[in-house]
From Swiss-Prot:
Compositionally biased region (Basic and acidic residues): 227-242
A GO biological process held by the record: regulation of transcription by RNA polymerase II
GO MF assignments: DNA-binding transcription factor activity; DNA-binding transcription factor activity, RNA polymerase II-specific; protein dimerization activity; RNA polymerase II cis-regulatory region sequence-specific DNA binding
Stretch list, region Disordered: 150-171, 219-245
Location of the protein in the cell: Nucleus
Major localization class: nucleus
Subunit comment: Efficient DNA binding requires dimerization with another bHLH protein. Binds DNA as a heterodimer with MAX.
Tissue and organ expression note: Detected in adult testis.
Organism name: Homo sapiens
Protein name: Putative myc-like protein MYCLP1
Length: 358
């Protein structure tokens, strides 16, 4: 038990090292997964670690009534089988790189269908209860509290669903930088070599699953052609032969002439603006001329300004307003006089009628 608690299982063991943060894989990366030889001799019972520890103790039947005896019994089973589980999970994995890469490539090449369900990959004839290495259906209480915590996305080695294949991808960095992807794959337990193992894939190149950034989108249309001067300036320091320089000098004018003949000349912004300004100036002059002619006509209607040749617009408006008030008063006075004359006319008609009756 003490040996299992303090014995390290990998070469170059470093407690403070976090190999998930590594972004530069090397040829010796799989040496991290080269396991130290097991502390016991690998004999006929090496494939099944349960046989090397002897027969399993029978399930307790008469301990349901006494809680203290049950707790002591569970502690004894915990001390016995925790070591067995750790040995089974740590010493029965891959020890070389080629079988691991072959298994992963086969698994990823086959791929899961769209309607993937983990139960489709389970073997119907296989009974986990009969396997000595799978203790989940026999000891659910012991395996419910794992001793060693795995990473947040990977499953614990003592998971009860051993016959299922689960692939989990973990992304630790942003899309713009290189990031390792941790994949946990669980294979069939019927094969003694296929057990839970962890691999770390470092993405060195472009992540093809990531969306394209906006600046990398392809622009529609043909690219703009370089002017002849810029083309000559860029090609001159290249150190090419004289013949190539002559070809470069002669080609751009032909392309420019073809482009000018095919494409119509666009209207320049200055010409457009000048046309708009010219039309606006014409309308403004017309408005001012109409206004001036109207003011001159109004000045001629006002008797006080008829003899004045140069009068401001404000003076014309003031005198015209006063003249309108005078005309309104004269009209009212004339209307009153008209009513008086109408009244006198009626009185005279009545008098004529009275005198004609005699």
């Amino acid at each position: 038990m003490d040996r299992d608690s303090y014995h390290h299982y990998f070469y170059d063991y470093d407690g403070g090292e976090d190999f998930y943060r590594s972004t530069t894989p090397s040829e010796d990366i799989w040496k991290k997964f080269e396991l130290v030889p097991p502390p016991w001799d690998l004999g006929p019972a090496a494939g099944n670690p349960a046989l090397s520890f002897g027969l399993l103790e029978p399930w307790p039947v008469g301990c349901a009534g006494d809680e203290t005896e049950s707790q002591d019994y569970w502690k004894a089973w915990d001390a016995n089988y925790a070591s067995l589980i750790r040995r089974d999970c740590m010493w029965s994995g891959f020890s070389t790189q080629e079988p691991l890469e072959r298994a992963v490539s086969d698994l990823l090449a086959v791929g899961a269908p769209s309607g993937y369900s983990p139960k489709e990959f389970a073997t119907p004839d296989y009974t986990p209860e009969l396997e000595a290495g799978n203790l989940a259906p026999i000891f659910p209480c012991l395996l419910g509290e794992p001793k060693i915590q795995a990473c947040s996305r990977s499953e614990s080695p003592s998971d009860s669903e051993g016959e299922e294949i689960d692939v989990t991808v973990k992304k630790r960095q942003s899309l713009s930088t290189r990031k390792p992807v941790i994949i946990a794959v669980r294979a069939d337990l019927l094969d003694p070599r296929m057990n839970l193992f962890h691999i770390s894939i470092h993405q060195q190149q472009h992540n093809y699953a990531a969306p394209f950034p906006p600046e990398s989108c392809f622009q529609e249309g043909a690219p703009k052609r370089m002017p002849p001067k810029e083309a000559l300036e860029r090609e001159a320091p290249g150190g090419k032969d004289d013949k190539e320089d002559e070809e470069i000098v002669s080609l751009p004018p032909v392309e420019s002439e073809a482009a000018q003949s095919c494409q119509p000349k666009p209207i320049h912004y200055d010409t457009e603006n000048w046309t708009k300004k010219k039309y606006h100036s014409y309308l403004e002059r017309k408005r001012r001329n109409d206004q001036r002619s109207r003011f001159l006509a109004l000045r001629d209607e006002v008797p006080a300004l008829a003899s004045c040749s140069r009068v401001s617009k404000v003076m014309i408006l003031v005198k015209a307003t006063e003249y309108l008030h005078e005309l309104a008063e004269a009209e009212e006075r004339m209307a009153t006089e008209k009513r008086q004359l109408e009244c006198q006319r009626r009185q005279l008609q009545k008098r004529i009628e009275y005198l004609s009756s005699y």
